[in-house]
Amino acid sequence: EAGHTVDVIGPKEGETYVGKHGYPQKAELSAKDAKAKNYDLVIIPGGTSPDHMRRSEHMVAFVREAVKLKKPLAAICHGPWMLCSTDVLKGTRATSYMSIVDDVRNAGANWVDEACVVDSKSGRSTVITSRTPDDLGAFMKAILSLIETGSAQGTKGKPVAPGWVK
């Protein structure tokens, strides 16, 4: 809708992956063949796909290459699971779906209950994270702003985590 080119990268080129709501998505390129240097930003989807993605050595290697090149990264819902496998979360502010709060914290992030968090410390990848599909508007606003202007702002939103998540 915003006029940007998007490539769907998966463990295997041509493989169709079906999300938890039944929507199919075909990988246009394998992670083994994809080069992070060719992309302005890497978006990691939510749902259970990041759990499968992080089991692929080539998917992890692609995201690690993006981190090394200081490419911006965006992850929503369970997407930060993939970031946990790359060391990019160390020292960042980040958010995620509440069931992976401990994973995000164990990866070194300061987890916060905000709709969209943008961590853009100098000298490293900008990391954009969001909690749930309800935060998709704030998530995409931050991504598009970063692509189009070079900077982005987070959105606090209403807290959604239960009291035991502190």
Model-derived regions, located:
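Active-site-adjacent substrate-recognition loops and nearby beta-strands
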Residues: 97
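Catalytic nucleophile serine of serine hydrolases
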Residues: 77
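Extended, subdomain-level signal for the structured scaffold at the beginning of enzyme domains
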Residues: 1-69, 73, 81-93, 101-166
